[in-house]
Amino acid sequence: MKLNKIKIAIDSPAGAGAGTQSKLLSKHYNLFYLDTGKFYRVLAYDKIKNPDKFNLKYIKKRIKKIKLKDLNHKKLLPNEIGIEASKISKNRIIRKLIDGIQKKYAYSPPKKYNGSCLDGRDITYKILPDADFKFFLTANIKTRAKRRYMELKKLDKKIKFNDVFKSIKQRDQSDYKRKISPLKKTKDSILIDTTHLTINECFNKMKNIIDRGVNINRNSKNLKLNN
């Protein structure tokens, strides 16, 4: 394993912490970060705003034009976008088109980075099956719903916890049972239950595993770490 080409794959059900930890690890190890689910959220947003023109021809053109900055827009965060994105991600043709783009970023990140860190469905077994480190984060549904509720409340003060809870439950059933790229833990993924862990506690647990795996420290010549 080359330290300057480290690859990390993280998956989790909604609200378990994959996104948060991926960002923290990417910053610490100077890795290119990609939230793969955001690609589907971009399409979901387009479908909701312009349902009449949302067809395969449009989708193919739109996917080619998606830029990294498009993935970070706040307009992609609402719950309705996530629900629609989950539906779109079940389309085999759309998924194949997006998979190609994600693999390109995963295996050929910009040169200024030490490698890549991706989170999302099927990352550990389809997009980055040979990742140096694979993590599957989980937490009980009440905890996950609470986290998601606090996040969404910043966007919509009228949102209700029960609605978020039901949404998370439906999302779980959909993600775990769908035929195309279902949510699942691979045998070689490290399971971490974040139910009773703070963000920092979870980060340190994952960091320690990675540090032990590559046997590095802050004085390594091959991997420059960020504070």
Describe these PLM feature segments.
Residues 8-10:
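Hydrophobic anchor at the beta1->P-loop junction of P-loop NTPases
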Residues 2-3, 76, 82-83, 100, ...:
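NTP-dependent small-molecule kinase module
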Residues 13:
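P-loop (Walker A) phosphate-binding loop of NTP-binding proteins
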Residues 19-20:
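Walker A/P-loop
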Residues 116, 132-136, 189-191:
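Short, well-ordered beta-strand core segments
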Residues 39-116, 122, 142, 146, ...:
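ATP-dependent small-molecule kinase phosphotransfer cores
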Residues 26-36, 49:
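Post-Walker A helix-loop "phosphate-sensing" segment adjacent to the P-loop in P-loop NTPases
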